[in-house]
């Protein structure tokens, strides 16, 4: 009986204890492999994310390492601005979505813009220096004439141009009723007023204004008869057309003379 119990006990112990060991081994191996699987999956996810941020399967720009901006954009060094803009827009559309390609294209385009700006600036400086040199080398009478000329602000030019253009239009509108004597008088008074503001001398302003009116009237009386008659309205008299030339002289004298 005891032997049977011993045998049964050994059987019981073997049936419960022996199988439990491999189960523990299997579980431990599974639990030990799980972190490595998670790490590998996360690594693949990060790798895919990085690839997608830098373009992934998007075509890449093949000239990213080309130093010359003209060669990088595929244009000639003598290309115009329109051609450079067209090349830049075409390349950005072709390689859109790839960050490094877009940065390379934009970098080359910005270099060309800066070089164009510097070249224009140098051209303007050289032009000013050449003009200044020519003025210094000009004869004395030309220097004295240039001393009487100045360049006012653009808003002043436009305001006075509008005033004398209005006087000319008013004279044309009233050409059927009478001559432009009143409009000419108003224009002369405005010219003298503007010159007096500038020179602070009423006598000098009157002298320049009357001289401009006489010069304009004289030039108009010489130029107008040379114009073919089919270009002139029948109601436009010689006096009216001469006054229009005089308005131009009055505008120039009160705007650019000092």
Curated annotation (Swiss-Prot):
Signal sequence extent: none
One protein family per Pfam: CPP1-like
Record's subunit section: Interacts with PORB in chloroplast. Interacts with PORA during plastid import.
Record field: transmembrane: 162-182, 207-227, 237-257
UniProt keywords, alphabetically: Acetylation, Chaperone, Chloroplast, Developmental protein, Membrane, Mitochondrion, Plastid, Thylakoid, Transit peptide, Transmembrane, Transmembrane helix
Major localization class: mitochondrion
Tissue: Expressed ubiquitously with higher levels in young leaves, flowers, and the root elongation zone.
GO function terms (MF aspect): protein folding chaperone
Single GO biological process annotation from the record: embryo development ending in seed dormancy
Knockout mutant characteristics: Reduced chloroplast biogenesis and chlorophyll synthesis associated with less POR protein accumulation. Photobleaching and growth inhibition of plants under light conditions. In dark-grown plants, reduced POR accumulation in etioplasts and impaired formation of prolamellar bodies, subsequently affecting chloroplast biogenesis upon illumination. Embryo lethal with arrested embryogenesis at the globular stage.
Membrane-topology annotation of the record: Multi-pass membrane protein
Region J-like domain required for holdase chaperone activity, residue ranges: 67-122
Modification N-acetylthreonine occurs at: 49
Family: Belongs to the chaperone-like protein of POR1 protein family.
Transit peptide limits: 1-48
Entry's localization field: Mitochondrion membrane; Plastid, Chloroplast envelope; Plastid, Chloroplast thylakoid membrane
InterPro entries: CPP1-like (IPR021788)
Protein name stated in the entry: Protein CHAPERONE-LIKE PROTEIN OF POR1, chloroplastic
Cited function: Essential protein required during embryogenesis. Exhibits holdase chaperone activity involved in the stabilization of NADPH:protochlorophyllide oxidoreductase (POR) proteins against photooxidative stress during POR proteins import into chloroplasts. Required for chloroplast biogenesis and development. When expressed in yeast, triggers mitochondria-mediated cell death associated with the loss of mitochondrial membrane potential.
């Amino acid at each position: 009986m005891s032997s049977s119990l011993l045998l049964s006990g050994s059987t019981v112990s073997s049936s419960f204890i022996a199988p439990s060991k491999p189960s523990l081994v299997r579980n431990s191996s599974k639990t030990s492999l799980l972190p490595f699987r998670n790490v590998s999956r996360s690594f693949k996810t990060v790798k895919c994310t990085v690839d997608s941020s830098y373009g992934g399967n998007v075509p890449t720009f093949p000239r990213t390492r080309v130093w010359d901006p003209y060669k990088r954009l595929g244009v000639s060094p003598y290309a115009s601005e329109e051609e450079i803009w067209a090349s830049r827009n075409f390349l950005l559309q072709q390689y859109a979505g790839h960050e490094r390609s877009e940065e390379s294209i934009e970098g080359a385009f910005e270099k060309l813009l800066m070089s164009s700006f510097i070249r224009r600036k140098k051209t303007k400086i050289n032009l000013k220096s050449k003009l200044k040199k020519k003025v210094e080398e000009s004869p004395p009478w030309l220097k004295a004439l240039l001393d009487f000329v100045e360049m006012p602000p653009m808003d002043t030019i436009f305001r006075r141009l509008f005033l004398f253009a209005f006087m000319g239009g008013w004279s044309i509108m009233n050409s059927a009723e009478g001559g432009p004597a009143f409009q000419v008088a108003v224009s002369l008074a405005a010219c003298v007023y503007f010159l007096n503001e500038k020179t602070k001398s009423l006598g000098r302003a009157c002298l320049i204004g009357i001289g401009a009116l006489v010069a304009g009237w004289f030039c108009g009386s010489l130029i107008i008869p040379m114009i073919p008659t089919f270009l002139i309205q029948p109601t436009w008299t010689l006096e009216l057309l001469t006054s229009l030339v005089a308005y131009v002289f009055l505008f120039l004298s009160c705007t650019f003379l000092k």
